[in-house]
Amino acid sequence: MKRTFQPSILKRNRTHGFRVRMSRRQGRKILSRRRSKGRVRLVVSVLNIH
């Protein structure tokens, strides 16, 4: 049986990346919440995976 998680950096960034977050109203809300909470990493990026 095939596993459900097949990692792809491109798909990950297109769904959860900074540019996508900024392009949508709800995404900007997510970023502001994470900023106010004091998160070091606001979004998932290629650098955060390694």
UniProtKB/Swiss-Prot annotation:
Belongs to the bacterial ribosomal protein bL34 family. The keyword DNA repair does not apply. GO terms for molecular function: structural constituent of ribosome. One of its GO terms (biological process) is translation. The gene is rpmH. PANTHER family: LARGE RIBOSOMAL SUBUNIT PROTEIN BL34M, MITOCHONDRIAL RIBOSOMAL PROTEIN 34 FAMILY MEMBER. NCBIfam families: rpmH_bact. This is Large ribosomal subunit protein bL34. It comes from the Bacteria. Keywords: Ribonucleoprotein, Ribosomal protein. It comes from Blochmanniella pennsylvanica (strain BPEN). InterPro entries: Ribosomal_bL34, Ribosomal_bL34_CS. One of its GO terms (cellular component) is ribonucleoprotein complex.
